[in-house]
Design a protein with these regions (language model features):
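Active-site core of glycosidic bond-cleaving carbohydrate-active enzymes
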Residues: 1-205
Length: 205
């Protein structure tokens, strides 16, 4: 079908999009670090098959599908809406696939993935950002406002108003006393995004 197993090669486990995305994320990271196009050439067919598999899994969207869950920002003191995360991950998958297709000279596929990324990004910002305050919200419209939601939005590039999202990340970090309110996915990028937003002292604290 194209789905990647959470445990390879034996199969099993669980995780969904937040684990399966590693197939795309890691291939691009290896290419960026070493510049070896053969990495992308070797794994592109599998990544393309995975993206085809994801087409009917309900993203972008706000309906929970077991095929794309169940894991989010695991072990975080503050829970971030799963659908907010899953849609953000899907955006980054599409965005990276457009870059990978471009690097491989597959122009038509590059444009297809670019269009998908634009569609997901529009949906994410309309669904998970409150228009008045610019704070993040859950799929049901209630307030989310977690460090992870802002850090992911910045790191993955899904936020349209990066300045406003960055300000909320800094505000939230200060509001919880410069403690870590993130889990598996938010922690590694938290200080990076604070620093990127010019809040170096906040990151140190």
């Amino acid at each position: 079908e194209g789905q990647y197993p959470e445990i390879a090669p034996v199969g099993g486990g669980f995780g969904g999009i937040t684990y399966e995305c590693a197939s795309i994320f890691m291939a691009w990271e290896l290419y960026e670090q070493y510049g070896d196009i053969r990495t992308l050439e070797k794994f592109y067919p599998g990544m393309q098959k995975y993206m085809d598999y994801m087409k009917d899994k309900g993203l972008p969207g706000t309906k929970v599908n077991p095929a794309i869950g169940p894991l989010g920002d695991w072990l975080a003191p503050e829970e971030t809406d799963l659908l907010l995360l899953w849609n953000a991950f899907y955006y980054k998958e599409a965005d990276l696939m457009s870059r990978i297709a471009g690097a491989l000279g597959r122009t038509e596929e590059q444009h297809q993935y670019e269009a998908l990324a634009a569609k997901v990004k529009k949906f994410w910002n309309e669904t998970f950002v409150l228009p008045d305050s610019g704070k993040t919200c859950n799929a049901d419209g209630t307030l989310c406002d977690t460090q992870c939601s802002y850090a992911i939005a910045l790191s993955y590039g899904v936020a349209e108003d990066r300045k406003r999202i960055g300000e909320h990340l800094i505000r939230k970090t200060r509001a919880i006393g410069h403690t870590v309110g993130t889990g598996f996915f938010g922690t590694g990028i938290l200080n990076q995004m604070l620093t990127e937003q010019g809040a170096v002292e906040d990151a140190w604290k």
